[in-house]
Amino acid sequence: METSASSSQPQDNSQVHRETEDVDYGETDFHKQDGKAGLFSQEQYERNKSSSSSSSSSSSSSSSSSSSSSESNDEDQQPRATGKHRRSLGAGYPHGNGSPGPGHGEPDVLKDELQLYGDAPGEVVPSGESGLRRRGSDPASGEVEASQLRRLNIKKDDEFFHFVLLCFAIGALLVCYHYYADWFMSLGVGLLTFASLETVGIYFGLVYRIHSVLQGFIPLFQKFRLTGFRKTD
């Protein structure tokens, strides 16, 4: 009995020792797994941090590159604007001393501004004193007509011209009444005479001829006036 009891005690002790070893081994495995999990989480955190820092650095570099490109574009535009301004100033002041030369400067600019259209054959351009004329028409005829109008001071609605035509109509009326003794027929002849003379005078240049003839008699009237009012001793 004693031998069996003694043999059973070592077996129990060895079993307890094995159980304690198993528990210790399990605890060490659990600590190892915890350590591995902690290391993995720390490595993942460091990776996330490095990726976020790299993305922020790339965004900052892109923003800095865009700002530098915009600044370079502004600098390119500013010299172009200054060059255009200098060219415009140089067109008005071609000489080096800053004073406009003869025949240059503002007249050229105004001439360019007065150019209304392109080089089409029917464009409207300024033509000096005769106003706007059509390019392609004869400039000599327009200038001659303008000079005649300035010299004679004639308009198509000139009161003197209408008065002369009215005198012709009244004369025709009186002659017709003298021959026919009928006022109705005389008024008709007078109105027809007045209308026909108005039409011919306005549309066929009779007004210019009448004025030229009358102005030919003006020097004679002035001579008679001077001789008539001359003082005698």
Swiss-Prot record:
The modification N-acetylmethionine is found at M1. The chain crosses the membrane at residues 160-180, 187-207. Residues 105-114 have a biased composition (Basic and acidic residues). Residues 1-14 have a biased composition (Polar residues). Residues 93-104 have a biased composition (Gly residues). Residues 1-143 are annotated as: Disordered. The modification Phosphoserine is found at S137. InterPro entries: TMEM40. Keywords: Acetylation, Membrane, Phosphoprotein, Transmembrane, Transmembrane helix. Its main location: membrane. The keyword Acetylation applies. GO terms for cellular component: membrane. Residues 50-70 have a biased composition (Low complexity). It comes from the Eukaryota. Disulfide bonds: none annotated. The keyword Ribosomal protein does not apply. It is found in: Membrane. It is a multi-pass membrane protein. This is Transmembrane protein 40. It comes from Homo sapiens.
